[in-house]
Amino acid sequence: MSYFTDFVRGFLDLGATVILPVVIFLLGLFFRQKIGAAFRSGLTIGVAFVGIFLVIDLLVKNLGPAAQAMVKNLGVSLNVIDVGWPATSSIAWASSVAAFIIPLGIIVNVVLLVTKVTKTMNVDIWNFWHYTFTAAMVYAVSGSIWQALLAAVIFQVICLKVADWTAPMMSEFFDLPGVSIATGSTISYAPGIYLVKLLQRVPGLNKLDADPETIQKRFGAFGESIFVGLILGLGIGVLAGYKPGDIINLGMSMAAVMVLMPRMVKILMEGLMPVSESARTWLNKRFGEREIYIGLDAAVALGHPAVISTALILVPITVLLAVILPGNQVLPFGDLATIPFVVAFIVGAARGNIIHSVIVGTIMIAISLYIATDVAPIFTDMAKGTNVQMPKGSSEISSIDQGGNNVNYLIFKLFSLFN
């Protein structure tokens, strides 16, 4: 078993830029694409994800330190440190159940596709770590591998069904036809879609419109996404207490993210569409006319400027929430730069209305902080024995992403009732 576990971890360590091209190439062959066409699709998607993750790296490396400086300037002192998704995923893959999740997840997805329970073929294998973490939490309280695997399957099924539900949004708003998102962190904020719809019925608030197109019409060239990124970056730099040169550098970096990300997503779609069409043709021949979606990393939604704009505004709001919310013990840190991933569905439901997205995003993040506070004890216990080190000055750790994930939390609490 240890050899198999090492193989799985070694494969995952290759990252999405290697895993996805391989998976897409094999899928292309399976769906009767010619070898050259399948290879080109896989290679194009690999190149696109290299570009996407380079832009994300630019975002994280610049926004992360700025957010941390903001926390330091406010003199915030809380007992639980948000260690971020990299540490959380390490805890997940170090668990006793980790080796079973990927093969089980693939089997479950195939069965649900064949039985027409889902329309999503999720190739985002790397993000199976979300299911793995849920399984690890349940295993920690139950000691039962069967309960742990069942918990992972429940989370996966929920993710696939939400991915099906939101796929039309991905096509209509994000201009990503045939694509769905089943990433666990993004799925967690799907209830925010209902809050957006509720907000759109509130007199006064429903008249506030600040989507990128409206902003551009109102401010002309200065309303373009490149200028919005610059202004938001400069604002965060000021709040972080940066020197003038560093403020300008942060502004330029955020402007670059706004411009480059949509272009990387276009390259991704160039590689994905042939495979998606081949899959749809193959399935229609065997199972009748039906829609099929390719499940991808939530990073593809970051191509819309309203997502990045909303996330940048929510960074200082998240820090402020941590200070003023009674009972919260989590100090936002590692996951501040992952906010763009969790708000994607909210922004899509709001049709890019940044004001509505920020309001609903604030509510959802507040909920995440409370959940992350509640699971901090078991989160900390799970981290013991792994390579995750406790930050200095903290008694416990958690994360806003998976630790504050409401789907993960509900599943964990459900199984806790019986153990």
Regions found by a protein language model. Give the residues of each.
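Cytosol-/stroma-facing membrane-proximal "stalk/adaptor" domains immediately downstream
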Residues: 360-375
